[in-house]
Amino acid sequence: MKLYSSPVAPSPRKVLIFIAEKGIENIEVENLDIGKMEHKTPEYKEIAPNSRIPALVLDDGGVILETTAICRYLECLHPEPNLFGTNPDEIAQIEMWYSRISFELMMPLMHGFRHTHPHMSALEDQNNEFGLAQRELALKSMKYYDSVM
């Protein structure tokens, strides 16, 4: 298998952490340079038509996109240590916290960065006011998660 990743992007980092926690060693990793638009090349778009990272290319040539889908696939192949829960309560708690952190923290962080960082202006249209508001939401979420962890 081969994982297309990027050292500067948070979504592939989640998959890489998952792989490390599972102790999986047989996945080749190819890093794409987002700054050089390597994720927008025709070659990569054949793998991931939406140009998003990460992408996991399976040994049979199939492709899995999206962080959670990749992690769930790897969990099925490598069930130990279990990282998605073993009973209904664990599964629900893990899913709840993953969703909350994704929507309440990661999305505002991502939008704040994308809409306010000068480097990102070459990659997408920016709305500075929106970005600043998202950064405030992210800071509020970080304070909350600091208090509950």
Placement of each model-derived feature along the sequence:
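GST-like domain detector, emphasizing the conserved glutathione-binding G-site
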Residues: 1-132, 136
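Amphipathic alpha-helical packing segments from all-alpha helical-bundle domains
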Residues: 130-149
